Design a protein with these regions (language model features):
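Class I SAM-dependent transferase core
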Residues: 1-36
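Conserved SAM/SAH cofactor-binding pocket of Class I
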Residues: 30-115
Length: 115
């Protein structure tokens, strides 16, 4: 059974992937709290896993749009579920995308790229 991992404003489901929430994801997600971004920032999360860092970015930067790329099917499924269930669903995008094979038109200016 997939028991959610609860954070401040959202719950994270991770039952379809082998990559579980770890300290590194929580630290990476907390790091931008010491930084500022422009209004309506555009953030890219490469290798998003279950979406925890993307969700933390959306929580921290209330008007940012976060694009997440993930290639592993289970993680992609979990991230899709987590994004849809979050209060930030309208600002989160998940794509089955590989960084190495991204097409030029998929690259537009990002204010922050995390991985």
């Amino acid at each position: 059974m997939d028991k959610p991992f609860y954070l401040k404003q959202f719950a994270l489901h991770q039952g379809n992937t082998a990559q579980r929430v770890g300290t590194d994801a929580l630290l990476l997600g907390a790091w931008p709290f010491v930084h500022t971004l422009p209004e309506k920032a555009h953030i890219l999360d490469v290798g998003a896993g279950t979406g925890i860092v993307s969700l933390m970015m959306a929580q921290r930067f209330s008007d940012a749009v976060v694009e997440a790329w993930e290639v592993e099917d289970g993680a992609l499924k979990d991230a899709t579920t987590n994004f849809a269930a979050s209060p930030f669903a309208d600002r989160l995008r998940i794509h089955s995308q590989d960084y190495l094979h991204a097409k030029r038109e998929q690259w537009h200016p990002f204010d922050l790229i995390i991985s």
